[in-house]
């Protein structure tokens, strides 16, 4: 490489890394994977080392990625919040160990190995045991104050527990990661899929975008979690732990959520064995892990090892190489969702990926196909996005055949032929035809599903037939099906026809929240539907609601319903065809069961823990909700009762600590009966 080429490449790489830093840290919308990003930074660092005359000025290789965004107050960390050096190489990990042994002149150094959580880095400050501030890493010197949003995280205590033998510092910055569990991420994506909305790519991006919402009510809709494992400023200094392993014990004793497991190791071989064991177990963790963090255990030795301007020299992240595969893209099919969103899907030659056979993968949307220049016939790289959803992340241009031409996204709906539209500010392309057969099928399937009014016998196959025959054009048509028509669907169908009609008739008396959920209002899932049912008590009242019924003086009137959801509900019922569906449901005799506002359980919040003698958790939940109560996942001072069975866990301990009434099944049934 000539000097001119080196200077040009350094400038090009600096611009690329800066752009990807902006997309990842500030917008939570990365366009490349960690592996590609780390490769760019590594190439830049190597060139800057080889050509120092062209490496003047601030380099992204020496800076912490900056996550500060508009709309938040900035707060200065009392102790700099660094990022970690990382590697994908076993050799480099062993060299890290050997360097510390050499520099500290110590054999037998002890290390702690922790899961590397794929979330958003945060620093939580406690003063005299009370939570006073939560701040993002920002640029390492100062970050965004997200205290109000962090307080919506149910697992994050506002006050530290006091424990025998464990000091409680006057001031401590405790560092960790905010994340979404895999279960919660999949729940949110299921809701979006039902609504025909584009799926989120991975839990990390969604968690980062959520914690930076300006409205904490919106943050509370997604069940963020936090795990804490590090420390910043500690006052007094005498309250510092002697080792990292000891600090983990303190974090747990204070009642804070910490890593599920960590390893200790002496020597490079033991470190590598622990990393491999962690890799084998990472699918069992509640959070996404993309590597292992190796830390020198002794805190005094950490201080001796010191740090660079960006990273501690006593820690390193070993990142697991992404599980990816190369295969050929045979076709692109476009699916139409319940709300008309067109989602492109890659049809692939089957390939093994993360222990499963993958033959289909998401292409996200029209813009992503164009940006990556993905063409039918290309050899593409497929990766599990966030270890969960298969996605096409790029193309192998070296294997592109001359006949592979740029993909042209459909200008008409592939199902009904209607010209597609793209609303301003949206990446989604939609079919605007409300009568599009696929949209009708998806809406009816959703309404009749177990999650909604639960019409037994009306599965996907039956709905397909009803729509194809022209007997069902919208949800209310379900209640006007004629027996004589259904009897024409085959021989000996009298019994199944009568059972279906009985199930349809019975569904007219389903719980109100099930009807609300069945309407498919954007952003309003089952939990929101239950809140709306308790508040409005009827479909017509909900359909006629005004903004002031949801938001008053910039505050939410209904628990769990923030401004974004309120506006989505109002927009839904402002559409004449949606309002007509409600009117028609009432006309055909639907009479939803309304939560009992006069019950002793009305307005009460329950938390369930352990195994009850006779009731399943679902049965107890259904009875509470039918009586106007609410079931929550976490215990707080606002909890009315904890319903506890055998083998009750930490929720029972927390209830006792907060003096929340604890009842058994017998007492619960007495409350339910009004006794």
Curated annotation (Swiss-Prot):
GO terms for biological process: DNA repair; DNA replication. NAD(+) binds at residues 34-38, 83-84, 114, 137, 177, 295, 319. Pfam families: BRCT, DNA_ligase_aden, DNA_ligase_OB, DNA_ligase_ZBD, HHH_2, Nlig-Ia. InterPro entries: BRCT_dom (IPR001357), BRCT_dom_sf (IPR036420), DisA/LigA_HHH (IPR041663), DNA_ligase (IPR001679), DNA_ligase_AS (IPR018239), DNA_ligase_CS (IPR033136), DNAligase_adenylation (IPR013839), DNAligase_N (IPR013840). Keywords: DNA damage, DNA repair, DNA replication, Ligase, Magnesium, Manganese, Metal-binding, NAD, Zinc. The keyword Cell inner membrane does not apply. Residues 596-675 form the BRCT domain. Zn(2+) binds at residues 413, 416, 431, 436. Its cofactor is Mg(2+); Mn(2+). It catalyses: NAD(+) + (deoxyribonucleotide)n-3'-hydroxyl + 5'-phospho-(deoxyribonucleotide)m = (deoxyribonucleotide)n+m + AMP + beta-nicotinamide D-nucleotide. GO terms for molecular function: DNA ligase (NAD+) activity; metal ion binding. GO terms for cellular component: cytosol. The active site is at residue 116. Its EC number is 6.5.1.2. Belongs to the NAD-dependent DNA ligase family. LigA subfamily. DNA ligase that catalyzes the formation of phosphodiester linkages between 5'-phosphoryl and 3'-hydroxyl groups in double-stranded DNA using NAD as a coenzyme and as the energy source for the reaction. It is essential for DNA replication and repair of damaged DNA. PANTHER family: CHROMOSOME TRANSMISSION FIDELITY FACTOR 18, DNA LIGASE. This is DNA ligase 1. It comes from Opitutus terrae (strain DSM 11246 / JCM 15787 / PB90-1).
């Amino acid at each position: 490489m000539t000097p001119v080429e080196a200077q040009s490449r350094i400038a090009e790489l600096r611009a690329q890394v800066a752009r990807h830093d902006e997309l990842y840290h500030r917008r939570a919308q990365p366009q490349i994977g960690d592996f590609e990003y780390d490769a760019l930074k590594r190439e830049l660092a190597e060139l800057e080392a080889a050509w120092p005359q062209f490496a003047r000025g601030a380099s992204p290789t020496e800076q912490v990625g900056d996550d500060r965004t508009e709309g938040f107050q900035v707060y200065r960390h009392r102790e700099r919040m660094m990022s970690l050096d990382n590697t994908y190489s076993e050799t480099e990990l062993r060299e890290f160990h050997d360097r510390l042994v050499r520099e500290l002149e110590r054999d037998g150094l002890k290390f702690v190995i922790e899961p590397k959580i794929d979330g958003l880095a945060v620093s939580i400050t406690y003063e005299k045991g009370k939570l006073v501030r939560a701040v993002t890493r920002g640029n390492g010197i100062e970050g965004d104050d997200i205290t109000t949003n962090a307080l919506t995280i149910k697992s994050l205590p506002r006050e530290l527990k006091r424990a025998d033998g464990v000091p409680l510092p006057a001031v401590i910055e405790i560092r960790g990661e905010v994340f979404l569990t895999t279960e919660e991420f999949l729940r949110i994506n299921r809701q979006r899929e039902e609504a025909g909305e584009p799926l989120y790519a991975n839990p990390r991006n969604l968690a980062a975008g959520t914690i930076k919402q300006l409205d904490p009510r919106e943050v509370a809709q997604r069940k963020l979690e936090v795990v804490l494992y590090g420390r910043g400023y500690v006052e007094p200094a005498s309250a510092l732990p002697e080792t990292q392993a000891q600090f983990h014990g303190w974090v747990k004793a204070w009642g804070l959520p910490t890593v599920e497991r960590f390893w200790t190791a002496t020597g490079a071989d033991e470190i590598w064995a622990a990393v491999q064991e962690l890799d084998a177990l990472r699918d069992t963790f509640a959070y996404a892990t993309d590597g292992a963090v190796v830390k020198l255990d002794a805190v005094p030795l950490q201080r001796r090892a010191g740090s660079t301007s960006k990273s501690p020299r006593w820690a390193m992240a070993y990142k697991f190489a992404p599980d990816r595969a190369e295969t050929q893209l045979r076709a692109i099919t476009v699916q139409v969702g319940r709300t008309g969103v067109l989602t492109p899907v890659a049809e692939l030659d089957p390939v093994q990926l993360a222990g499963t056979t993958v033959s289909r993968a998401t292409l996200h949307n029209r813009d992503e196909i164009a940006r990556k220049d993905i063409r039918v016939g290309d050899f593409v790289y497929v990766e599990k996005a966030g270890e969960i959803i298969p996605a096409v992340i790029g193309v192998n241009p070296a294997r592109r055949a001359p006949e592979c031409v740029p993909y042209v996204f459909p200008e008409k709906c592939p199902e009904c032929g209607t010209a597609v539209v793209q609303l301003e500010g949206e990446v989604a392309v939609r079919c605007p035809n409300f009568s599009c057969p696929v949209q009708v099928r998806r809406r009816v399937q959703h309404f009749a599903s177990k999650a909604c009014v639960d019409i037994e016998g009306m599965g996907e196959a039956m709905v397909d037939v009803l729509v194809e025959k022209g007997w069902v054009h919208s949800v209310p048509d379900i209640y006007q099906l004629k027996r004589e028509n259904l009897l024409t669907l085959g021989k000996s169908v009298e019994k199944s026809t009568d059972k279906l009609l009985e199930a349809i008739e019975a569904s007219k008396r389903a719980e109100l929240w099930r009807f609300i959920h069945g309407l498919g209002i954007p952003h309003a899932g089952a939990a929101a539907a239950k809140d709306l049912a308790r508040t409005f008590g009827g479909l017509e009242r909900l359909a006629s609601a005004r903004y002031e019924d949801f938001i008053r003086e910039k505050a939410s009137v209904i628990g769990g319903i923030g401004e974004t959801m309120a506006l989505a509900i109002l927009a839904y019922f402002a559409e004449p065809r949606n309002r007509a569906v409600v009117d028609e449901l009432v006309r055909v005799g639907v009479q939803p069961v309304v939560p009992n506002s006069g019950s002793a359980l009305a307005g009460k919040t329950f938390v369930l823990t352990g195994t009850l003698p006779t009731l399943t958790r679902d049965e107890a939940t259904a009875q509470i909700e039918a009586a106007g109560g609410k079931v929550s996942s976490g215990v707080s001072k606002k909890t009315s009762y904890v319903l506890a069975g055998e083998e009750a866990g930490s929720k029972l301990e927390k209830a006792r600590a907060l003096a929340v009434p604890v009842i058994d099944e017998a007492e619960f049934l007495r409350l339910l009966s009004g006794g």
